[in-house]
């Protein structure tokens, strides 16, 4: 760290410590650092970037987010003059592989077992299936795209462990599929980042991303949509991204330039997640008796949630109701569901999923 003959260091230790302290020390000593460690960049990326700027050094982390997709450098360089409004993506290959398997007919347990056999999922798959890995990557994208470094607790996260094959069957009937999507918005309503499974229209670019592939969709005032897709992780894509950062770093060092990442500034306030609006897909099991649908619709109406469509299928003395709502805030939908759950005619609230808008 104190060797003046060393200009560039690659950190691939994994975990947060001791790598974090090593990177801080290296940047403080004017050395540039390349890391593939999303945990560190998500945890203290803004601090590390500031440290690099103060000490005329650079921090490179292309391999930390969707390593096989060159997305960070275009965001930093090619789009530096663009006013970005939304970045959304499939940024965890394990969960996307599992959801693709479920769309093709597997149950959740079989999809997970196969992912583990193939090495996509760890023996403890929590970080992948509960959206934690995608959350860290979303935090990095938030920093680069909008100049916001949210705390871990500020990024609402919901995983895929409650998704069932029946959800996919219904999604298909609605010309949609289900994806775990990280979504970051920065507009007149404010800034918000979240990760959760959504029903997404089959025509949307993210719907066609299958298996362990990743994709990032960038939207701005002048560019409409740009889509970056490819392998998100693995030894070869990660190594390729690191080598690319090495070459970029060598160019920077050779030209005696630094601070190649001019961070954008957040122009809005952080928006409370409860105020974020979504359309909703709700699946209920109810007693097949007169007045049930009217009672449920009335409850939604009391909380200002408007129903767009309803499908009802009878199953003996029970019926399955599938409702899709117009856009409504999280808090209003949650209040509606809480009250609907207490209705005597409602047997089970089977699924509540957001619809990508």
Positions of predicted regions on the chain:
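A short hydrophobic/small-residue beta-strand
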Residues: 32-34, 307
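Conserved active-site and cofactor/substrate-binding residues in soluble primary-metabolism enzymes
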Residues: 4, 43, 66, 70, ...
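Substrate-binding/catalytic subdomain of NAD(P)-dependent oxidoreductase enzymes
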Residues: 101-102, 110-208, 213-215
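ATP-dependent carboxylate/acyl-activation modules
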Residues: 204-275, 279
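Rossmann-like NAD(P)H-binding beta-loop-alpha module
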Residues: 53-133, 140
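Rossmann-fold NAD(P)-binding glycine/threonine-rich loop
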Residues: 13-29, 36-77
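A structured beta-alpha segment of the ubiquitous adenosine-cofactor-binding alpha/beta core
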Residues: 1-8, 12-18
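A conserved regulatory-domain signal marking ACT and ACT-like small-molecule sensing domains
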Residues: 246-357
